[in-house]
């Protein structure tokens, strides 16, 4: 784990392992370090806003002994997907699968929101079957409609607003 000052009011904890991320997430949900106003969760980082470096250091020392517990899911949402998108055939071809196999593999997992980002309300979802991992498009589309489901690398995502992508 790396710990560094981030701007004039933050401390960034980065390069977190899964165990460190789980431990710290559990800890911030139980109580932030002194003088810390809020936190922002990244893919492998946590930004503590308003935190003072010394207070974070002490808080981390206390956290290191914290048992890693499974994080309680905040709820499950069922999202209906219309598999008639323009890229479905090219995804199947790139993965050496049939369209039916892509749909089955994509719709089978229970996904977990890893983080929010890229655009307002866009969830990066863990759980995508490795056979569907694809690089991002070499050139983004100018306009993606809200509700569009995407695959980028090892993640699925859902566009909540119209945007390039």
What residues fall within each predicted segment?
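Glycine-rich active-site loops that engage anionic ligands at enzyme catalytic sites
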Residues: 1-165
């Amino acid at each position: 784990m790396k710990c560094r000052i981030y701007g004039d009011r933050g401390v960034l904890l980065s390069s977190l392992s899964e165990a460190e991320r789980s431990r710290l997430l559990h800890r911030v949900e139980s109580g932030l370090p002194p003088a810390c106003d809020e936190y922002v969760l990244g893919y492998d980082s946590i930004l503590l806003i308003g935190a003072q470096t010394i207070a974070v250091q002490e808080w981390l020392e206390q956290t290191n002994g914290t048992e890693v517990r499974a994080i309680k899911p905040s709820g499950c949402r069922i999202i209906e997907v219309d598999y008639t998108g323009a890229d479905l055939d090219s995804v199947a071809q790139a993965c050496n699968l049939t369209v039916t196999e892509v749909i089955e593999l994509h719709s089978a997992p229970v996904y977990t929101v890893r983080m929010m980002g890229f655009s307002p309300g866009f969830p990066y979802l863990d759980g995508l079957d490795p056979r569907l991992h694809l690089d991002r498009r070499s050139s983004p589309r100018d306009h993606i409609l809200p509700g569009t489901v995407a695959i980028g690398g090892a993640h699925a995502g859902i566009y909540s607003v119209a945007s390039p992508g």
